[in-house]
A protein has these predicted regions:
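C-terminal motif of bacterial Sec signal peptides marking the signal peptidase cleavage site
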Residues: 14-16
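A short helix->beta-strand "capping" segment at the edge of beta-propeller domains
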Residues: 20-38, 68-74
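Surface-exposed loop and turn segments in beta-propeller and other repeat-based domains
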Residues: 31-33, 75-81, 157-165, 201-215
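Beta-rich, blade/repeat-based domains predominating
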Residues: 37-48, 81-92, 121-134, 138, ...
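Conserved beta-strand positions in repeat-built beta-propeller and related beta-rich domains
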Residues: 53-57, 96-102, 137-141, 181-185, ...
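Short loop/turn segments that connect beta-strands within beta-propeller blades
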Residues: 66-71, 109-113, 148-152, 193-197, ...
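Blade-loop segments of beta-propeller domains
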Residues: 71-107, 113-125
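Hydrophobic, well-structured mid-protein blocks that either form specific transmembrane helices
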Residues: 105-162
Length: 252
């Protein structure tokens, strides 16, 4: 489990957005679904209408093909105890899975989930998505990395909110030409313009999971999935008992 023993600046939640280009949103819950409380969610995405999830922790890391209605795994990969699995995505016929500090990434066949190869990865693995051309990754800093299918870096982009770097970028999702990113340990999601790294939107997810659902194992918000087939957006968190379909409402 990642720990930061420092006072974390809450820039994304407390900065006043004087810039009219930065829109602020709250959430409307459209529907809710069961989510496995053993899932320390690191990656969440849809591919061809099917939901997938990668989960972390040493000795507990998995990749799962998940039934949305029940939250149960239809197919599952379990990883060696040496690996703390992070973000994942399907891209160009392959499944890509990152690890946190092992500096390794795994590639599987997207259809069968059969193992194909292991790659040396140049940084900590955190979030992972794609824009149809490049893999896009975070590493817990304020940077996002654009890579080809062999993890060769093509571009690095600093993410800023009103000129200030936004650190701890975590799980990523590419939605309608923008990158959505969880900001680790906060209830905030930032919407990023991939061309210049500027934050164009702030999503306040405070209270998404009601306190009545909290258990000692309940952890932070992390997990953004966009189903292109339906246009629906889903959010969850680490060891949460629920996954939510949500809609954005712009704050007045």
């Amino acid at each position: 489990m990642k720990h930061f023993f420092a006072i974390f600046f809450m820039a994304v939640t407390i900065l006043s957005c004087g810039n009219a280009k930065v829109k602020e949103y709250k959430l409307e819950v459209v529907a809710e679904y069961p989510h496995d409380t053993d899932s320390y969610t690191q990656g969440l995405f849809f591919d061809e209408g099917q939901m997938y999830e990668s989960t972390g922790q040493y000795g507990l890391s998995t990749f799962r093909k998940v039934d949305l209605q029940t939250g149960k795994a239809l197919q599952r990969l379990d990883f060696n105890d040496d690996y703390f699995v992070e973000g994942s995505v399907m891209f160009k016929g392959n499944l890509y899975v990152l690890t946190w500090t092992s500096r390794k990434a795994f590639v599987y066949d997207a259809q069968t989930l059969e193992y194909k190869s292991t790659w040396k990865y140049p940084r900590e693995g955190w979030g992972l998505t794609h824009d149809g051309t490049h893999l896009i990754a975070s590493d817990g800093s304020a940077n996002i990395y654009f890579m080809d299918e062999n993890f060769a870096q093509k571009r690095k982009q600093l993410v800023t909110l009103e000129g200030r770097p936004v650190r701890f970028l975590n799980e990523l999702e590419y939605i309608d030409g923008k990158i959505w990113a969880n900001v680790y340990t906060t209830d905030s999601i930032v919407i990023i313009n991939p061309k210049d790294g500027k934050v164009t939107g702030l999503i306040d997810c405070t209270g998404l999971l009601p306190k009545s659902f909290y258990e000692p194992s309940t952890d932070v918000l992390n997990g953004i999935a966009y189903d292109k087939k339906t246009g629906k957006i889903y959010l969850t968190g680490k060891n949460w008992p629920r996954l939510y379909e949500v809609r954005l409402i712009e704050k007045k």
